[in-house]
Amino acid sequence: MKTFLIFALLAMAATMATAQFDPSEQYQPYPEQQQPILQQQQMLLQQQQQMLLQQQPLLQVLQQQLNPCRQFLVQQCSPVAVVPFLRSQILQQSSCQVMRQQCCRQLEQIPEQLRCPAIHSVVQAIIMQQQQFFQPQMQQQFFQPQMQQVTQGIFQPQMQQVTQGIFQPQLQQVTQGIFQPQMQGQIEGMRAFALQALPAMCDVYVPPHCPVATAPLGGF
């Protein structure tokens, strides 16, 4: 009888131990407990964006400081020329060497944590210049032929109103549809290239990743 009671007690103890340490009942964070982590991440991202907005005036100054780097990138200096519409501007090797030295000198003077966003602002200025170069040609090809057809037979006082109502929305859609995706892709490609080429050329460290402004900064 005693033996039976002992076995019964041991079985009960084993059952209780199994229930207490059931792996399926281990602690798991609830969604309510995960919310503070997500909120902290969102706050950190907002702080980075606010810091970037505060740095924009400084980045515009650094953009001017890196003007030699911009000139070096757009000119036909070694294999660094990456802007198609400026490849005809070929410089002498001596001029390229001077420009390279000036670029490296200015890049070294910029604080390390600001080099990446400063290079990005230079790339944005180059792409904005490229957009300004091509957009008048696009406007001329799109606007003038259709304007000539529509304005025939329309009185001069009404012509300006009609052409503005017809062509300006279409022209805006065409230019936005062509330039905005293309410009964003060019910015990303040229930014990646510049973040590799300039540090290697100047033998300076530039962080490979940095928060960057999405809105175009002032050009040169």
Curated annotation (Swiss-Prot):
Keywords: Disulfide bond, Pyrrolidone carboxylic acid, Repeat, Seed storage protein, Signal, Storage protein, Vacuole. CDD domains: AAI_SS. The modification Pyrrolidone carboxylic acid is found at Q20. GO terms for molecular function: nutrient reservoir activity. The keyword Repeat applies. The keyword Repeat applies. It is found in: Vacuole. Residues 1-19 form the signal peptide. Disulfide bonds join C69-C202, C77-C96, C103-C104, C116-C210. It holds the Pfam family Gliadin. Gene3D superfamilies: Plant lipid-transfer and hydrophobic proteins. Its main location: other. Residues 41-56 are annotated as: 2 X 8 AA tandem repeats of Q-Q-M-L-L-Q-Q-Q. One of its GO terms (cellular component) is vacuole. Residues 128-146 are annotated as: 2 X 10 AA tandem repeats of M-Q-Q-Q-Q-F-F-Q-P-Q. It comes from the Eukaryota. Sequence repeats lie at residues 41-48, 49-56, 128-137, 138-146. Belongs to the gliadin/glutenin family. Monomer. Seed storage protein. Serves as a source of nitrogen, carbon, and sulfur for the young developing seedling. This is Avenin-3. It comes from Avena sativa.
